[in-house]
């Protein structure tokens, strides 16, 4: 049987999934993106060179890897082509190693304009989206008016449906949002410039992947965002528009659940999130500034400064349960090197409720504002861990921190990232 791995973010995205996938892809045949769009930003550092991918799977940097964009993804054509050109400028030959599902819904400029128009209208209650048009594109998919990659094979049909959609959105822009209209001719003309490249990559992805499984090939399914942003299991309404849990591999790529192997959960040694929404362990002041500076906590897609906080075991336990996570990949351990003390949230107290201890998430969304984290405190190791590749070489207090995380979540920490480069990794047996 083939060895298939699902790589899932355990927080609010930005956990370092790209680096983990890039590392694991050394022994893989396929890497598959199965949900999300170009709102994801996966940062890789190879030979001290930083590469940020938004659409293409992180395994694309390996010459032997076939990269798949499956049906659960929403694809913005120009961003996709730009990313290909970016990698080709690095002398990577990739076009013949990329396949796209005919069922991928496409993102158009009217989706982006709608995204931004809505955020402007919400004022203080905005979600904090990336403004990439992801939400409106998924809305069109669910409303059954979306245009798919496969529709490009019949340009007469495509043109007619696109004009209908442009008229649909322009009506809203004019009458509800009081913004400028979008041009059908401009959108269609720009799409024609890149359509041949996209058409050349269309393939039957479920058939391709299931044949690969039968041939004992190794497949990595690369998640985007994180479980706490999942449309169903995230902290609603501050969520993304797709399902970012392990179960979405089946619907987003067209493979059966029995063909999934290990579920790797990627988690930072602390917490971050971009955008608005509850964040029980959020830090402010000097500690927040420390993590932003030394962790370079700025969004790969938006450039926005990430909010920072301590590791939250309550949320991690829930994420492990939802995803059936079998192995933990702990990233950015080295960012904790200079701290005097390190905290882990092990439970919550609900403000105003005496002696009430919470070991799970609240039922009422308003209760998120009343949560007070309960912490365990650890002494910092105050030693350099960057670039360490053997677990036994870690400082004693760093190992104690990792062991305590394992005790609390009941899942082994298998991979530890000790720096940005692809070689800064510890594998535990």
From Swiss-Prot:
Domain of life, source organism: Bacteria
A Pfam family matched in the record: Adenylsucc_synt
This protein's UniProt keywords: Cytoplasm, GTP-binding, Ligase, Magnesium, Metal-binding, Nucleotide-binding, Purine biosynthesis
Pathway(s) this gene product operates in, as recorded in its UniProt entry: Purine metabolism; AMP biosynthesis via de novo pathway; AMP from IMP: step 1/2
GO cellular component labels: cytoplasm
Family: Belongs to the adenylosuccinate synthetase family.
Protein name as annotated: Adenylosuccinate synthetase
Organism for this UniProt entry: Buchnera aphidicola subsp. Baizongia pistaciae (strain Bp)
């Amino acid at each position: 049987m083939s060895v298939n791995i699902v790589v899932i973010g355990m927080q609010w995205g930005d956990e370092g999934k790209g680096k983990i996938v890039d590392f694991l892809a050394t022994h893989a045949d396929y890497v598959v993106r199965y949900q999300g769009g170009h709102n994801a930003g996966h940062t890789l550092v190879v030979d001290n060179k930083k590469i940020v991918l938004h659409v293409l799977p992180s395994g694309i940097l390996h010459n032997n890897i076939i990269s798949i964009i499956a049906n659960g993804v929403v694809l913005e054509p120009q961003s996709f082509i730009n990313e290909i050109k970016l990698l080709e400028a690095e002398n990577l030959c990739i076009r013949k190693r990329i396949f796209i599902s005919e069922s991928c819904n496409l993102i158009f400029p009217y989706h982006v304009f709608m995204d931004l128009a809505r955020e402007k209208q919400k004022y203080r209650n905005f979600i904090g989206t990336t403004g990439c048009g992801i939400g409106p594109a998924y809305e069109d998919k669910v409303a059954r008016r979306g245009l798919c990659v496969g529709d490009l094979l019949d340009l007469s049909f495509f043109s007619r449906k696109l004009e209908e959609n442009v008229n649909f959105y322009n009506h809203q822009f004019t009458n509800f949002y009081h913004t400028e209209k979008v041009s059908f001719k401009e959108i269609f003309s720009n799409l024609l410039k890149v359509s041949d490249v996209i058409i050349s990559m269309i393939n039957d992805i479920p058939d391709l992947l299931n044949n690969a499984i039968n041939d004992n090939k190794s497949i990595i399914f690369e998640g985007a965002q994180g479980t706490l942003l999942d449309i169903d299991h995230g902290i609603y309404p501050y969520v993304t528009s797709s399902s970012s849990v392990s179960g979405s591999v089946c619907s987003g790529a067209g493979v059966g659940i029995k063909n999934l192997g290990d579920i790797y959960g990627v988690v930072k040694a602390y917490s971050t999130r971009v955008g608005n929404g509850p964040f029980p362990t959020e830090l402010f002041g000097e500690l927040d500034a420390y993590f932003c500076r030394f962790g370079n906590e700025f969004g790969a897609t938006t450039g926005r400064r990430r909010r920072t906080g301590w590791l939250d075991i309550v949320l991690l336990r829930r994420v492990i349960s939802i995803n059936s996570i079998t192995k933990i990949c702990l990233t950015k351990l080295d960012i904790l090197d200079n701290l005097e003390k390190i905290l882990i949230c092990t439970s919550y107290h609900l403000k105003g409720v005496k002696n009430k201890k919470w070991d799970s998430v609240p039922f009422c969304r308003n209760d998120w504002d009343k949560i007070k984290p309960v912490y365990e405190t650890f002494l910092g190791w105050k030693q350099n861990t960057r670039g360490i590749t053997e677990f036994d070489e870690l400082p004693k207090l760093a190992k104690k921190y990792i062991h305590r995380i394992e005790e609390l979540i009941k899942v082994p920490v298998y991979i530890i990232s000790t720096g940005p480069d692809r070689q800064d990794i510890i594998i535990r047996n």
